[in-house]
């Protein structure tokens, strides 16, 4: 069981970001439950890059907390490459304040949430959202964090 992480820090201020060790802890709590090996990129960006990508790929004219770009292997090619997570530092920090959550817990939630997207989970339909949120809650609580959706319940 191994996870290869390509960590890219593409924001001006690196102070207060989760460590690579934190990111690996969170990834190891999720991915091995679905597949034994994986390779992925986590790119931590500023609002400008998040806004541009969110506009280009989702048609949304604003930055967002996390974007997931699953790798789609050509037919007949099997790779452990999961894809890329793009996480916007400022949005995560603002949401943590708005939702009255510890910042580290919200970072963990964004990594868990994005990883589940890379593994094929989605939340477009209500039943999918319920399944994904339930799994996120279970994984977060398994790492000692509170239910990330407690404020919505």
From Swiss-Prot:
It is an enzyme of class 3 (hydrolase). Its main location: cytoplasm. Pfam families: YbeY. It is found in: Cytoplasm. Gene3D superfamilies: Metalloproteases ('zincins'), catalytic domain. Binds 1 zinc ion. GO terms for biological process: rRNA processing. InterPro entries: MetalPrtase_cat_dom_sf_prd, YbeY, YbeY_CS. Its cofactor is Zn(2+). The keyword Zinc applies. Keywords: Cytoplasm, Endonuclease, Hydrolase, Metal-binding, Nuclease, Ribosome biogenesis, rRNA processing, Zinc. Zn(2+) binds at residues 113, 117, 123. One of its GO terms (cellular component) is cytoplasm. Its EC number is 3.1.-.-. The keyword Hydrolase applies. GO terms for molecular function: metalloendopeptidase activity; RNA endonuclease activity; zinc ion binding. Signal peptide: none annotated. Single strand-specific metallo-endoribonuclease involved in late-stage 70S ribosome quality control and in maturation of the 3' terminus of the 16S rRNA. Belongs to the endoribonuclease YbeY family. This is Endoribonuclease YbeY. It comes from Aliivibrio fischeri (strain MJ11). The lineage of its organism: Bacteria, Pseudomonadati, Pseudomonadota, Gammaproteobacteria, Vibrionales.
């Amino acid at each position: 069981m191994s996870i290869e992480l390509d960590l890219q820090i593409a924001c001006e201020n690196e102070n207060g970001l989760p460590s690579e060790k934190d990111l690996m802890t969170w990834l190891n709590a999720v991915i091995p439950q679905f597949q034994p090996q994986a390779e992925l990129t986590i790119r931590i960006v500023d609002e400008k890059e998040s806004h541009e990508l969110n506009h280009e790929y989702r048609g949304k004219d604003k930055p967002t907390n996390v974007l997931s770009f699953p790798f789609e292997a050509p037919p007949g090619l099997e790779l452990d490459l999961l894809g890329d997570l793009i996480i916007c530092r400022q949005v995560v920090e603002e949401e943590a304040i708005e939702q009255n959550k510890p910042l580290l817990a919200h970072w963990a939630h964004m990594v868990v949430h994005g990883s589940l997207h890379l593994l094929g989970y989605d939340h477009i339909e209500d039943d999918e959202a319920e399944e994904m949120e339930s799994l996120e809650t279970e994984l977060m609580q398994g790492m000692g964090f509170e239910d990330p959706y407690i404020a919505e319940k």
